[in-house]
Every structure is written in C-alpha cells, then in structure tokens.
Amino acid sequence: MPRKKTTDEQSQIALFQAPEVPNAFRKPVQVIHSKPKTSLSLLHRKLANAWLKNASDTPSDDGWWTIHTATMATDIGFDSNNRAYLIDSARALMGIIFEWDVIAPEGKRKLWKASVLFPEVEIRPDTIRYQISRPLREQVLTPEMYAMIDLNVLKPFRRASSLALYEH
C-alpha cells in the first residue's frame, strides 16, 4: 500500500498541535481563600503554586522540599536570569502572613489562625529548598477540600488579579 505523502509544512504543524499534558495539583481551599496581609504579586502566586505542587508530588526530606530552579522556571513561565528578583520574591513570600478561615463570618468562626505558609527558603545555584509551616503541612499536603490548579494554565497570565480569579 503506498504511503500518503505529507509536505514538510504539514509535518511541522502536526508537531505543535499536540495537546499539552496537564500539570495539575490539588490546592487546598484554605490557601485559596486565605487572606494575605499584604498583596501577592504574580510571581509570588506562581512561586507558591509551584512549591505547593512540588510538595504534593515529592516526599519531604525532614520537612524540606527541593525543586530544581530550571524545572520551577519552566513550570511558572519564569524566563528571566535575574536571580536577585527571584530571591526578593522568595523573601517577600516568606514574610506574607495568611489569615485562615476567612469565608466564615467573624462572629461564627470556630478558630482564627494566622501564619506564614513558607517559613524558610534556601536558594542555591540550581535548586530551591523550602519548608511548609508545620501546623499547616497536613492541610496543605492532603486537603479534604481543594481546587485543581494547572500550572500550564497559569503560565500565560500577566497579572496577579487574573491568576487569583482563575484560582477562585
């Protein structure tokens, strides 16, 4: 049986039309509906999502998770070599205090809680190591209620507000 002839153009187009494999994870609603005391930039939100996904996909090393900088950059669409900007964003993310259970009316809350989600971060030339707050670790890693967040969908976002709307 003769082979169907294809042109180079058809072959090239076919290469780029394959659907992208989802890069999803379960983000706890407690994190989505938390209220940071300061605003989160787009990079803060993308970093937090990449770190939470990595933590849910890989086992910890005595409470520390490691992610390769190149993998993280690909996951969040960070195409800059500006290491100082990455360090500043990680530092700022460490200082953001989240209030938990902000959906319930103030008078009806069973528990008010505030904490830092990522209390410690180490940035090395090729890896980033981070911790998730010990009291929140169980809720973050095995959430009962969650939203499926796909990092591939987050990549093209250029505004923190659009990413926040997608998550909600």
Predicted segments, located by residue:
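Charged, alpha-helix-forming regions
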Residues: 1-168
